[in-house]
Curated annotation (Swiss-Prot):
UniProt protein name: Ribonucleoside-diphosphate reductase small subunit
Cysteines paired by S-S bonds: none
Oxidoreductase in keyword set: yes
Described purpose of this protein according to its UniProt entry: Provides the precursors necessary for DNA synthesis. Catalyzes the biosynthesis of deoxyribonucleotides from the corresponding ribonucleotides.
EC numbers for this chain: 1.17.4.1
Record note on quaternary structure: Heterodimer of a large and a small subunit.
Record: active site: Y108
Catalytic activity: a 2'-deoxyribonucleoside 5'-diphosphate + [thioredoxin]-disulfide + H2O = a ribonucleoside 5'-diphosphate + [thioredoxin]-dithiol
Keywords: Deoxyribonucleotide synthesis, Iron, Metal-binding, Oxidoreductase
Family: Belongs to the ribonucleoside diphosphate reductase small chain family.
One GO BP: deoxyribonucleotide biosynthetic process
SUPFAM superfamilies reported for this sequence: Ferritin-like
Cofactor note: Binds 2 iron ions per subunit.
Length: 322
């Protein structure tokens, strides 16, 4: 743990790169940068008004959770990880992630603002942590890991759970609407945001892999399953805000969350505990995979031009055959 948390007083510049495994994550985040203004919300309101009341209720509360949870993630980054982690390459990633999480929060707020015309209801959703028990319970679990009384290793694993598991059921449910060709603005922003969160999850796993003093495997599995993670997400998406409301099968959703959790455990260097298969074949490309994943594929070919290219790719050549 010393390498990560000990201050590098002589590193005020990025180069030379001392952590070649960490730096590419910053470049990936930079390559995938987008803004809320790039999403076309124009047809969403018509689609939203055509939904039944159960579907509307589900979308409203999922967006309320997302809007609130991004604030918690931001707090965790700014108060804890950016301050504690001393690797310059990691600080670059965390700094960029803060900007990206702000964009996620803005996007969810715009969607709520676009869908909900009643001011009182809109304010209730914006203050979901205080007003909506299902959101409050989930947010409280995420928020408690900001507390410095937990070890750094515990908090980095818990943060991986927040970004890798606690969003998974909601992401999956929104892709259910994409499968039905509805809510194009919401579903496209969901593609971009789920890609970003997958990258953030993988980065948490990378930082954990660099720790000298890792947690016992059973403790990691407990954080993922019992202490929060899987059980919290199942409770939210299958009970408090059941995905049955939109026509999805809660049993299969539980299985999907277990599948995602197993992928995360493997990414953290631990054994699977559920051995569940992905029950939604249409989610194969967008589940939170570890190495070669959907986020490498880049949604809708969305990547900043040239950012991930190597220097040799920019060589001007006159003898190329056409």
């Amino acid at each position: 743990m010393r390498r990560i948390l000990n201050k590098e007083s002589d590193r005020f510049t990025l180069y030379p790169i001392l952590y070649p495994d960490v730096f590419p994550f910053y470049k990936k985040a930079e390559a995938c940068f987008w803004t809320a203004e790039e999403i076309d919300y124009s047809s969403d309101l018509k689609d939203f008004e055509k939904l039944n009341e159960n579907e509307k209720h589900f979308i409203k509360h999922v967006l309320a959770f997302f809007a609130a949870s991004d604030g918690i993630v931001l707090e965790n980054l700014a108060v804890s990880f950016l301050r504690e982690v001393q690797i310059t390459e990691a600080k670059k990633f965390y700094s960029f992630q803060i900007a990206v999480e702000n964009i996620h929060s803005e996007t969810y707020s715009l969607l709520i603002d676009n869908y909900i015309k009643d001011e009182k209801e809109r304010l209730n959703l914006f203050h979901a942590i205080e007003n909506i028990p299902a959101v409050k319970n989930k947010a409280l679990w995420a928020a408690k890991w900001i507390n410095d009384t937990n070890s750094f290793a515990e908090r980095i694993v818990a943060n991986a759970c927040v970004e890798g598991i606690l969003f998974s059921g909601s992401f999956c449910a929104i892709f259910w609407f994409k499968k039905q060709n509805k809510l194009h603005g919401l579903t496209f922003s969901n593609e971009l945001i789920s890609r970003d969160e997958g990258l953030h999850t993988d980065f948490n796993c990378l930082i954990y892999s660099l720790l000298d003093n890792k947690l016992p495997e059973q403790m990691v599995q407990n954080i993922v399953k019992e202490a929060g993670g899987v059980e919290v997400e199942k409770s939210f998406i299958c009970e408090s805000l059941p995905c049955d409301l939109i026509g999805m099968n809660s049993r299969l959703m539980s299985q999907y969350i277990e599948f995602v959790a197993d992928r995360l455990l493997e990414c953290l260097g631990c054994s699977k505990i559920f051995h569940s298969k992905n029950p939604f074949n249409w989610m194969d490309l967008i589940s939170l995979q570890g190495k070669t994943n959907f986020f490498e594929k880049r949604v809708a070919d969305y990547q900043k031009s040239g950012v991930m290219a190597q220097r040799k790719d920019h060589v001007f050549c006159l003898n190329t055959e056409f």
